[in-house]
Structure formats: structure tokens, C-alpha cells
């Protein structure tokens, strides 16, 4: 019998910090975007189904709905933004990485209150949890380039502070 670790269990009995409501919402947004992109689910059915999923009650519902709707409605703009920084056509990316890149780009465009490094870190964590083995490295590199375009002052200030 195979045993799987839950989100709160780790091999050395080291407890991970509890997930924030926004991090949980990002996970559900990613799952919804995957259902939309791969399974052809529509926005309304994703919004109706998500609250039934385990753990959704602890997620930031407002962030979930706004972000899911925003990514879907701005998909062309987000794909265009990401496409200038990738090494292949967008539709050749893994579905998980494509959804995470759209999510990260959406947040950079629409959530100025969230530092770009937080957005990138959240995208990396999502990719580690749901994506391919080294997908997080790719996502990190692409979103760093996106941040330099969408948030040039913030990126420059961070580089200046590191000196």
C-alpha cells in the first residue's frame, strides 16, 4: 500500500508554515485555469465547483474569483506578454507552466500591492507542487524577465538595494 504525505506532513516531522488564504486561492486558481485550458471547462462551472473542493473554505474567495476571471478575460494580453520571453510557442509549454505564467503575469499587471518577488516565489512554489521536475527554474526565469518589463522601477530598486 502506498502512503502519500499530506500538505502538512514532511519526512523529518518538520511542519511547514500554514498556507495563507491567498496562497490557497492561487492553488485553486491554478486548478481552475488547468480545467479551463485542458478540459474546456467554462468560468462559471469552475467557480461553481471550486467551493466544493477540499480546503477551499480556507482560501481567499474574492482573490480566487477576481484572479480566475481576470486571467481568463485577459488571456490574449497575458500570453503576448509571456511569449516574448519564452523559447518556444506558448501552446507548446506544459499546461501547468502555461497557466502559472499567465497567473504570475496577471498578478504583476493587476496587483501592484503585491511585490513582484512574492509573485515569482508563489509561482515557483506552485510549479514545484504541480509542475514538472525543473519547471520552477523555467517559470522563475520567464517571470523575472516579465517583471523587468512590467515593474521596471520595483526591479531597479531591488537591484539598487542589493548593492
UniProtKB/Swiss-Prot annotation:
One of its GO terms (biological process) is transcription antitermination. Keywords: RNA-binding, Transcription, Transcription antitermination, Transcription regulation. Coiled coil: none annotated. One of its GO terms (cellular component) is cytosol. Involved in transcription antitermination. Required for transcription of ribosomal RNA (rRNA) genes. Binds specifically to the boxA antiterminator sequence of the ribosomal RNA (rrn) operons. PANTHER family: ANTITERMINATION NUSB DOMAIN-CONTAINING PROTEIN, N UTILIZATION SUBSTANCE PROTEIN B-RELATED. This is Transcription antitermination protein NusB. It comes from Dechloromonas aromatica (strain RCB).
